[in-house]
From Swiss-Prot:
InterPro entries: NGRN/Rrg9. This is Neugrin. Induction: Highly up-regulated in neuroblastostoma cells by retinoic acid treatment inducing neurite outgrowth. Belongs to the neugrin family. The modification Phosphoserine is found at S41. GO terms for biological process: mitochondrial ribosome assembly; neuron differentiation; positive regulation of mitochondrial translation. It comes from Homo sapiens. Its main location: nucleus. Glycans are attached at N158, N186, N268. Residues 26-48, 155-270 are annotated as: Disordered. GO terms for molecular function: RNA binding; rRNA binding.
Length: 291
């Protein structure tokens, strides 16, 4: 029994001595406080790294879950195009030349689209043909309600092609200048097209009217049999009546003109006028004018 007790006491003493040795080492060792270092302090940086990794993995899982839910809610396939090819080229140029000032959120705000659309544009390397560009731009502009601006894309300015045959023009194109210009900046172009069409349709009517006027003038200049004693009056009046009819007025000689003729030829001029059908003569038989 004594042996066992001595062994137990010896073991306790050794343990106490070892503890005292660790304590003395901790006191004598370098350190500002002089206390025993915490063994868990060596694991703090590793725990922080593990926590950061766990948080990043958690965020990634949440993002993946959000993407899955959004794909299920959205329609299948690519989203509808809302940008023209010119706008997409401008987005790529700005992001490539000025990446700091034109970031993805800034581009999305400037072009009024989502950030996903900007990322799709930046990732895409597809180069379509000119026909494909025009076709896709036409769809985009039709959805945006700007079909009239296709003339700027084609560069030809042939706006008459945009108006098919028999197309009824809306009332907004025929509004007064100030009101139409405030609502539609391209109303002048549409009015020009309409005016050109109406000019073409009215051209035959104008030609017929002019031909009729010329025919009337030719009939008015048909020589009339006058007395041989007065060729001078006939020649003079024909030259005088030619000037007002040449202007296209078609008016009859005024009273002032008749007074001038009377003053020039007082002997041969008579104030009495005789009507024979559509022709008018004086009392001496001289031809005056025709209706």
């Amino acid at each position: 029994m004594a042996v066992t007790l001595s062994l137990l006491l010896g073991g306790r003493v050794c343990a106490a001595v070892t503890r005292c040795g660790f304590a003395t080492r901790g006191v004598a060792g370098p350190g500002p406080i002089g206390r025993e270092p915490d063994p868990d302090s060596d694991w703090e940086p590793e725990e922080r790294e593990l926590q950061e990794v766990e948080s990043t993995l958690k965020r990634q899982k949440q993002a993946i879950r959000f993407q899955k839910i959004r794909r299920q809610m959205e329609a299948p396939g690519a989203p509808p195009r809302t940008l023209t090819w010119e706008a997409m080229e401008q987005i790529r140029y700005l992001h490539e030349e000025f990446p700091e000032s034109w970031s993805v959120p800034r581009l999305a705000e400037g072009f009024d689209v989502s950030t996903d659309v900007i990322r799709r544009v930046l990732k895409s390397k597809f180069l379509p043909t000119l026909e494909q560009k025009l076709k896709q731009d036409q769809k985009v502009l039709k959805k945006a309600g700007l079909a009239h601006s296709l003339q700027h894309l084609r560069g030809s300015g042939n706006t008459s092609k945009l108006l098919p045959a028999g197309h009824s023009v809306s009332g907004s194109l025929l509004m007064p200048g100030h009101e139409a210009s405030s609502k539609d900046p391209n109303h002048s172009t549409a009015l020009k097209v309409i005016e050109s069409d109406t000019h073409r349709t009215n051209t035959p009517r104008r030609r017929k009217g002019r031909n009729k006027e010329i025919q009337d003038l030719e009939e008015s200049f048909v020589p009339v049999a006058a007395p041989l004693g007065h060729p001078r009056e006939l020649q003079k009046y024909s030259s005088d009546s030619e000037s007002p009819r040449g202007t296209g007025s078609g008016a009859l000689p005024s009273g002032q003109k008749l007074e001038e003729l009377k003053a020039e030829e007082p002997d041969n001029f008579s104030s009495k006028v005789v009507q024979r059908g559509r022709e008018f003569f004086d009392s001496n038989g001289n031809f005056l004018y025709r209706i």
